[in-house]
Amino acid sequence: MGATLKQDILQCIGNTSLLPLRNIVPKNGSRILLKLESENPTGSMKDRMALAMIDAAEADGRLAPGGSVVEYTGGSTGVSLSFVCAVKGHPLHIVSSDAFAREKLDHMRILGATLQIVPSEGGGMTEKLTRDMIEAAGIVAGKTGAYWTDQMKNKDQMAAYHKMAEEIWKQTVGRIDGFVQSVGTAASLRGIGEGLRQDLWGLMNPGPWTLKKFWKEP
């Protein structure tokens, strides 16, 4: 059966492919599968969490039709929110900094977000800069009434990662022993891990130091 017709581009989020690693895995070694999150519209798994947060806020009235959204970010979360808000018709105010990659900031602007840049000290990220960005986002939300997604505290994103766990479970037909995820805030690792453990109690989340045994030596 061919690909189904999508009603809008947001339906292209998720249901990404699993790809087996072959050449770098020892013969008769473990089967290692990669989840190709680059297949999401902006090339990032953050599309999932951005859509989940906006959908939940719309559903319970925190975000009215055409209502504004604000968030502090400098990376893929900002790009994904810019994308989702553009499709859904929500003006987006991003609080960011010159400490982040210019390409990411330009991507957000191209997708229609308004950026407020908090100056860094020497171009580097510091705890103070993070606090300043959070404070600035809170001020914008307070003054304008915009919905603040507040990614560090927003539990709505867990629904996206639980759904991703369901995808993995179905794609592997339940044949999975461990799950590894590169993380920033670790929300994805927590959410996917929780989802998988609903079906497979005892699933391992091995630390990176344990992975060497899966690879061929150079």
Q: What are the roles of these predicted feature ranges?
A:
Residues 1-218:
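PLP-dependent amino-acid enzyme catalytic core
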